[in-house]
From Swiss-Prot:
Chief place of localization: membrane
Matching InterPro entries: Mercury-R_MerC (IPR004891)
Subcellular location: Cell inner membrane
Superkingdom classification of source: Bacteria
Gene name in the database record: merC
GO cellular component, one term: plasma membrane
Record comment: activity regulation: Uptake of Hg(2+) is decreased by iodoacetamide and iodoacetate, and is completely inhibited by the thiol-modifying reagent N-ethylmaleimide (NEM).
Spans within the Periplasmic topological domain: 32-46, 100-106
NCBIfam families linked: PRK13755.1, transport_merC
Topological domain spans for side Cytoplasmic: 2-10, 68-78, 128-140
UniProt organism field: Shigella flexneri
Protein name: Mercuric transport protein MerC
Lineage: Bacteria, Pseudomonadati, Pseudomonadota, Gammaproteobacteria, Enterobacterales
Length: 140
């Protein structure tokens, strides 16, 4: 993955989690963790975080993972990287107001964090170049 898509992916994931930490009424587990590390002052901005910033950061992470596919051509990595932001975006824009939206948001945020850690620990490598695709060597 290119440097810009890696930075955008990490920014999207981190921004989504910090935005969710600012909403004590919506996500009490994340809000208690946010208050423990000193983010309690963000509670006055929770409307802005949930309605504007959280979908924006989720869309940024989705776009970064979609553009990353053009670099490494690993569809499973890109798909897993795009599912989390899509869940977060759907929970904050289309499904807001349902009783299970917070649980869906937790799943999306956890998936975003998990894929970001996976990408940090094991970065994607290029599989296809302009001259064609290289297949891995066969084992006998």
């Amino acid at each position: 993955m290119g440097l810009m898509t890696r930075i955008a992916d990490k920014t999207g994931a981190l921004g989504s989690v910090v935005s969710a930490m600012g909403c004590a009424a919506c996500f009490p587990a994340l809000a208690s963790f946010g208050a423990a590390i000193g983010l309690g002052f963000l509670s006055q901005y929770e409307g802005l975080f949930i309605s504007r910033l959280l979908p924006l950061f989720a869309a940024l992470a989705f776009l970064a993972n979609a553009l990353g596919w053009f670099s490494h051509r690993q569809w499973l990595r890109s798909l897993l990287g795009m599912i989390g932001p899509a869940i977060v975006f759907a929970a904050t824009v289309w499904l807001l107001g349902n009783w299970w939206t917070a649980n869906l948001m937790y799943v999306g945020l956890a998936l975003m964090i998990g894929v970001s850690i996976w990408d940090f620990v094991s970065p994607a490598h290029r599989r296809c170049g302009p001259d064609g695709c290289e297949l891995p060597a066969k084992r006998l």
